[in-house]
Amino acid sequence: MMRKLRVLIPEPKSRFLRVKCPNCGNEQTIFSHATFPVRCLSCGTELVYSMGGKAKIVGEVVRIMG
């Protein structure tokens, strides 16, 4: 008899991140695979640049959520 192999459940590679703005220190939640540039809500500095797939994060990642 063949044993049944354990079926792994796929998990997404994308996450939500808590990012700190390098200019004003404001913390904001962003998506790791953002397709649109994200600006800081306080000072307007771009925190994330779209790079086609995974976004390039300019600010400091404080926490990975989820």
UniProtKB/Swiss-Prot annotation:
Q: Which InterPro entries match?
A: Ribosomal_eS27, Ribosomal_eS27_Zn-bd_dom_sf, Ribosomal_zn-bd
Q: How is the cofactor bound?
A: Binds 1 zinc ion per subunit.
Which chain segments does UniProt annotate as zinc-finger regions (C4-type)?
21-43
What keywords appear on the UniProt entry? Metal-binding, Ribonucleoprotein, Ribosomal protein, Zinc, Zinc-finger
Pfam families under this entry?
Ribosomal_S27e (PF01667)
The Swiss-Prot or TrEMBL record annotates one GO molecular function as:
zinc ion binding
Q: Where does Zn(2+) bind?
A: 21, 24, 40, 43
Cofactor(s) needed, names only, are:
Zn(2+)
Answer yes or no on keyword Transport: no
Q: Which PROSITE patterns match?
A: RIBOSOMAL_S27E (PS01168)
Fill in the subunit field for this protein. Answer: Part of the 30S ribosomal subunit.
The family this protein is said to belong to: Belongs to the eukaryotic ribosomal protein eS27 family.
Family matches, as NCBIfam families = PRK00415.1 (NF001629)
User: Any idea what this protein is called?
Assistant: Small ribosomal subunit protein eS27
Species name: Saccharolobus solfataricus (strain ATCC 35092 / DSM 1617 / JCM 11322 / P2) (Sulfolobus solfataricus)
